[in-house]
């Protein structure tokens, strides 16, 4: 599968809450930087002043009255600003962009879990990203039950995390469906393994997409994480 040069270094990390993708995003960013790449690390929603304000609205547990369509459009507004202000310029400059969640999360949460029409969600995603699509998406594969055990120590849940196990199960099924539909772009990572083993899988997939990460960089990233 061929990729445009500006898009080849756009990697997104996805999964249910508690899958460990944020840890892997941090490790991957360190390893890539140690390997000599310029890396922009982001997480959604957020990443710009405007997007962070929208994030606060979306995740505030007090906003229980928020409707599904309102939620979708807020996510897309935050994403559109992030692409416009940060992602597209970084890719044009030849940087590697890592994003902890992107539009696949919207598909899973708003279409599969909330029940919005999938084509409407797809159209909204496409409008927001303006042809800036990830070349590689890593889905950290773990069941909602396993993820819930990991999250138990976190304390208070945000508005999305508090939606319950049935909701998280639909999100999980959504990620499984997307991985089956787009195997060239979306790769499943066994997130039930140790952090080191999960990172080894992550690096293997990133290397397969043409980014050279030495074993020394991998080891150093893990050492820094443990400090």
Residue ranges and their predicted role:
Residues 13:
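Hydrophobic anchor at the beta1->P-loop junction of P-loop NTPases
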Residues 10:
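Walker A (P-loop) ATP-phosphate-binding motif of ABC ATPase nucleotide-binding domains
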Residues 101, 105-173, 177:
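A glycine- and Lys/Arg-enriched "phosphate-lid" helix/loop adjacent to the NTP-binding pocket
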Residues 2-4, 27-29, 145-227:
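NTP-dependent small-molecule kinase module
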Residues 24:
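Hydrophobic positions on the alpha1 helix immediately C-terminal to the Walker A/P-loop
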Residues 21:
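Conserved lysine of the Walker
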């Amino acid at each position: 599968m061929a990729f445009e040069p500006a898009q080849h270094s756009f990697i997104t990390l996805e999964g249910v809450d508690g899958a460990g993708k944020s840890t892997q995003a941090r490790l991957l960013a360190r390893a890539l930087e140690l390997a000599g790449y310029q890396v922009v690390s982001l997480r959604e929603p957020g990443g710009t002043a405007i997007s962070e304000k929208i994030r606060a609205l979306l995740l505030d547990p007090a906003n229980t009255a928020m409707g599904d369509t309102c939620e979708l459009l807020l996510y897309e507004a935050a994403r559109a600003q992030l692409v416009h202000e940060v992602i597209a310029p970084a890719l044009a400059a030849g940087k590697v962009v890592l994003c902890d969640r992107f539009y696949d999360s919207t598909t899973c949460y708003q279409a599969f879990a909330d029940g919005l029409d999938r084509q409407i969600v797809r159209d909204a995603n496409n409008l927001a990203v303006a042809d800036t699509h990830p070349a590689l998406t890593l889905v950290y594969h773990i069941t909602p039950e396993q993820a819930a055990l990991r999250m138990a120590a976190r304390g208070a849940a945000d508005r999305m995390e508090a939606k319950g196990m049935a909701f998280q199960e639909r999100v999980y099924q959504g990620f499984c469906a997307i991985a089956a539909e787009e195997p060239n772009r979306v790769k499943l990572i066994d997130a039930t393994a140790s952090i080191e083993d999960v990172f080894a899988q992550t690096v293997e997939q990133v290397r397969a997409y043409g980014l050279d990460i030495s074993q020394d960089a991998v080891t150093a990233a893990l050492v820094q994480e443990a400090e």
